Amino acid sequence: KRFLTSASEASIFNYGTSDVPTLQIRGDLGTQASLTGLTAYSLETTVADDNGEPSFNGNALGVFEKVRNFTYSASGAGTLDIDNIPREAFLNAIHLFPAADVITNVEVFVDNVKVWDASKERMTEVCTGSGRTVAAGDYHIDFLLNNALGSQLTLAGTSDFRLRITHSGTISLTAYAQYLTDFATA
């Protein structure tokens, strides 16, 4: 993550295993028929207690980014209100991938307060100004564009979180929500 600029921020995503009984990592190798083997490595560290002695408590899993996807659709031009995206403690970004280039504006509301309102053109300016490339038709709401850990949208304790998407024609889209979460809520 390019927004993790200090050692303490970078260590937030270290995967400790003291509280994990098993760990399974799955991947899709696709059409890599020529792949003859896969090698995995585990880096082990000794955790010290306050006196500098080895601690057998180890590191806990910590926090990590979770991505969940949802699909939505509406016929004709108009607005699509989405109010059923699950709320986690922190939202890093929402990425909208419609089947056709019909999104004209998106608003985000948290407890009836508008926290985002941008046309497709304005969103593209914001993203490209931060070094991102936006594919035609896609819409991104990224709260970490300023590279500051802690600028995520806080959703913990909120009772209302919704998107209002204005679209110029029939819309069918997949929304990807990126959360900062911990092992207990994964």
Question: Can you describe what each PLM-predicted range is?
Answer:
Residues K1-A186:
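Beta-strand-centric surfaces of beta-sandwich/beta-rich domains
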